Amino acid sequence: MKTILITGGAGYIGSHIVEQLVNINHNVVILDNLYTGYKSLVNTKAKFIKGDIKNIKLLRKIIKENEIETIVHLAALLNVSDAEKNKKKYYLNNIIGTSNLIRSCEN
């Protein structure tokens, strides 16, 4: 049985993916900062970690300690009008955060 990390797993799409993976008996770890997600959407059979993809040390720890085999990355900020006003926030989360996630997979 695979252990799968879902970033943004407490959001609408992420929580539905978690449900499906849990239903087919995968071990699921959710990483979500709850900026737009809701803890109430988290399946209790999944392991929930409140944290941020901008924290590369946390990402590396999660991947190593949970022996993550697969990652589904859904932790993104999406509001276009807000992105125009807060470019740095969106850059840090969507670009740097994704880069951190990729780098954390390196051995």
Question: Where is each model-derived feature located?
Answer:
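N-terminal Rossmann-like NAD(P)+-binding domain of SDR-like oxidoreductases, especially those catalyzing
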Residues: 1-107
